[in-house]
Each structure stands twice: as structure tokens, then as C-alpha cells.
Amino acid sequence: MILNSSTEDGIKRIQDDCPKAGRHNYIFIMIPTLYSIIFVVGIFGNSLVVIVIYFYMKLKTVASVFLLNLALADLCFLLTLPLWAVYTAMEYRWPFGNYLCKIASASVSFNLYASVFLLTCLSIDRYLAIVHPMKSRLRRTMLVAKVTCIIIWLLAGLASLPTIIHRNVFFIENTNITVCAFHYESQNSTLPVGLGLTKNILGFLFPFLIILTSYTLIWKTLKKAYEIQKNKPRKDDIFKIILAIVLFFFFSWVPHQIFTFMDVLIQLGLIRDCKIEDIVDTAMPITICLAYFNNCLNPLFYGFLGKKFKKYFLQLLKYIPPKAKSHSNLSTKMSTLSYRPSENGNSSTKKPAPCIEVE
């Protein structure tokens, strides 16, 4: 917990009554190394995703719009990652000034909300494409997808405004270091509680429930299709993919959300045990690595569910340029069905059930 604040030379001076919390030599070595790996892999992977979707696939489907924006949001975050690597390697000493502190912190917050919102919209799009293919044709347009992405970027920016306002550079007097951090006055609990609950609920709980519901309904629809076509072999890999998508999202973000909430309790003074604070401050950067590394892999993960994405991705790696006139589209592995149950749940029994194809 931080207390006893004063201002001098434009930098707020504060006291930290748990100055050793989270400060371990292995953290100062391991975390910058992980950040560096995430930076290299993320920049390389997401840049290739942008090139494949925009230049090879020509951005012709709703899913491709969401994946392109997902990759762009990740790239915005990744560009600030070297700052955090240096910050951690310097034992949490921030040398870049107040403006970069705000920008880098806002980038982290922005990526969290933008990525989660885009993944949620992608799950809704898959639900509409598979469960309600006929009814959703007028809704699943490129214009709607682009407008949705604009709204998502605006909402993510709005959700990041408190970070820009309240994240600052502070000088901790009893450790003689300058940090980039949030600082809450103990008598004002509205701000930290609001930020923490917003991150937990808007940044995880609601999106996870929507994603879980969407893919559960997709699961049921595909299962019903396989039951009708009893003479066709069931492709269990589709169901494994659905399960992997839900579990991938859940386990990527749950640890970070838990320790974020505990950190808010510490800032409010509700947790005053330095041992617990040490656990939280030590675990926080590790959960950040887990969450954001998986986040940066999402465009590749979702993209490789489509056969055409894999085809063009390999072409790019072989330096094969895109064709001048391309009519390719992005279809995730669950987006195209040659057989679809009718919207009211009834299916014709006069004709043999056609083969189900999932790309």
C-alpha cells in the first residue's frame, strides 16, 4: 500500500510501506526476456496476418475485418512493449517521462478492451453464420463489420481514458526510485473500485459469457447436423476447436483478472499484509505475459482455422506475391456448411442429408 504523498518539481512523492513487494532478481531477468520474446513473435506474426488478410485475401469477409483489426490492436500494444521490458529490467525504474508513461499504459488498457471486444464480435459472427445463416445475411455485411470495428475502437479508447488521466510518474521516497503507476488516495475508493470492476466485468466477465453462449449454440447446431447425417463420419476436430477457443480465452485472462482485483484491494488498504502484496506484485507481470502473449497469438490462432488463410500465409513465407485479381475470402473452420438446419429447426426427410463440409 502507498501512502503519505506530497508534490515536488511536478512529480508526486509518495511513501510505500511494502517497498520490497514484487522486487525479485528473477523477475527482473525473466519478465524482460518474456517481453522480448512476445515482442518479436507478436510483431512478426501479426504483421504477417495484416499482410495476408489485406493484400492476399483482399478483406472480403466479415471475419477478415475483425481479424485484421485484432492484429492491428495487438501491434499497437506491441510497439510499447520494449518500454515495459526496460522498465522491468531497471528494477521498476521509469526513465521515459510522464507522457510515455500515460501512452504506454493506455496502450495496454486499449489492447485489453479492443481485443476482448473483437473476439466477442467474432464469436457472435460465427454464431449468426452457422446457427442463423439465412436470417443473418442482411446483418453480416462488410459495412456493418467496419462500423462495428469503429465503435469497438471508440469504446476501447473511452475505457482507457481513466488510465491516461490517472496513470502518472511517481517518486517513491523510501526506495528512491521513479515509477509509472496508479496512485489512489485512501479516502477516495470510487476510482479504483470503478476501474477494477470495469476491467473485471466489461473486460472479461460479460465477453466470456457471450463467447461461451455463442460457441455452445454453435456446438449444438453442429451436433444436430451430424446426428441427422448418421451415415457420415463425425469430425470431432470441430468440437475440439470450439472447446479450445473457449478454454484458450478463459485461462488466458482469469489469472490476470484475479490479481488485478487483488491489487485494487491492496491500493484501497483493504489488504495490508506485505506478504500478500509481494505475492500479488510478483504474480502480476507473469499473468500479464500469459494474457498478452496469448492475445498476440489470437490472430494467427483464428486465422489458421481457415484453409485459405493457411494457403496464403505459406505463399507469403515463400515470397509468392498476391495475385492482382483475387476473389479469396476468409472462412474460419466453422464458417461454411453445405448442410444447414432450417431456421425453425425442421429438416426435410424426403432427400438424403447432404454432406456436411466445414472449412
UniProtKB/Swiss-Prot annotation:
Q: Which Pfam families match?
A: 7tm_1
- List cystine links: 18-274, 101-180
Q: Give the domain of life.
A: Eukaryota
Subcellular location per UniProt equals: Cell membrane
Do the record's keywords include Cell membrane? Answer: yes
Fetch the InterPro entries from UniProt: ATII_AT1_rcpt, ATII_rcpt, CCR1-9-like, GPCR_Rhodpsn, GPCR_Rhodpsn_7TM
- UniProt biased composition (Polar residues): 336-350
Arranged from A to Z, the UniProt key words for this protein are:
Cell membrane, Disulfide bond, G-protein coupled receptor, Glycoprotein, Lipoprotein, Membrane, Palmitate, Phosphoprotein, Receptor, Transducer, Transmembrane, Transmembrane helix
Is Isomerase one of the keywords UniProt gives this record? no
Q: Where does angiotensin II bind?
A: 15, 17, 167, 182-184, 199
Chief localisation class: membrane
Q: Which residues are glycosylated?
A: 4, 176, 188
* Annotated family: Belongs to the G-protein coupled receptor 1 family.
Per its record, how is this protein called by name? Answer: Type-1 angiotensin II receptor
Species the sequence originates in: Bos taurus (Bovine)
